[in-house]
């Protein structure tokens, strides 16, 4: 065939510099594109064999070779697929593939970095010109009588095609790398890119360095394969003093190891996979030495094709990033990590792989957001996660409880972000009580209602005889509006005083220590209008205090007024809110409470950066509660002119606040100094 020269028809001037600009962040995608082309060629050749239109040669092993040559600054991609004729090169390379590149550019030209194209698919063969000054193709078609073809182009605008000298069916693409891309001629860099994009492609991929010194292994002669290159036969005699026959060994050229696992775990039936398989795959893909808690194997053929494995990692929230990594594949070809348009946001704390061949690739992120098919994929993934968790709750409760502390933040986040997921999970949510026993919300509500009913019964018995008809009617209306109160703890150490008081009276509370719990209890209150969540220090529970007898009320009010006056004076705060109660726990002299409403207001202020504002503007200062049954409080009432009143008042206030929240540096300094002063008084 005569030499043929031609010029590509270019609609946009300088197409390749423009393409480089848009895919700069992922300019290594040319490796994925060229290897994918090779895989496609091999797949098509195998299909022709299955259809009887071509017979594969005996011993045929599909493979793709990638050869780097730092000295010559080249990178070669060689496949043994179906190859191309001169007409096919003309049609594919100069028309179809180039058309794909121009379409790629059309899609990109109006995109911003915020609306990036997913995975940069569609550039295909012309991605080679992102890194190469010159590209050559040598190919031989499988068709009988086909002649080899050599095609070359510098810069991608002009090309030259003539008869080549390739003798085996398939295609070789040689890239003469530009000065900015010489890194890809480095074997280690090339391996890194291949492992990123091609680790699970359906064809074996072998990387080698041109002119590299061969490496050898010594194996038992019985293990030598027909494909091995034996360089030496070795006879090993038994060591001196040892019995046995001489061992026959063979020194062979080290066998090449494929970069690609052609049958990754997610492509297998879950019944074929063992626990060790799942753990080994997790460690290999995510380089995490810790074992995952458990996993979900996705396997769906209808109404769309989706396979994958999602792992629930064990996260040390104090040190580890909560962000996970979910790798998205298309027919075992890597697309990108954490595509939030496809994978529900709350699943981003997981690690895993999802392979969806039906996923639209050559689209922007904004297009994916409004794609009905993509939404169905996200819904399916969310549903399978909920099904797995509900199944564990029902059939493997022991392990479910064991994992709960690790997985609960993720599940709660899912409930907040996904209405359907929240609905599916509502009966499988667990809450840990003060005895570290796990309960459902239904159990907690029943228990709380039982406690309140018992308390109400006792109170009702005391006052029933003196009620008028109007009062009884009013009480009936109040009961109807009254909500079931569920108390919770956010810090078992900080709030230990309140916890001990609750336990002493047989009262329970649930433990909610994660940052997400603040939003989650609001979500629960919206879902369960009859329930109100109160932090354990939001109020003094009725069970923690004694009622003031009718004949003592007048005197008790005088005591209260006196203590309010004393504390406001000694603490220099006329707005200080002070309550006096007859607490059952006589070891507690003072405590602080902050209403749930005010505390949530404080949290909201912090969230919106208003933490420096005066909390009293929103009525969100804590109330000091004094125990009228405690000797120190009684001393203050009886000796309000004592020289020790000031130090006792300040100490009782700080002790109450310590159990409620951390003191500021200034407050802590004053507290420590005052504590030392008190001890010095004891020495006198």
For each predicted feature, which ranges?
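GHKL (Bergerat-fold) ATPase N-terminal catalytic module, capturing the glycine-rich phosphate-binding loop
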Residues: 1-184, 192, 199, 217-219, ...
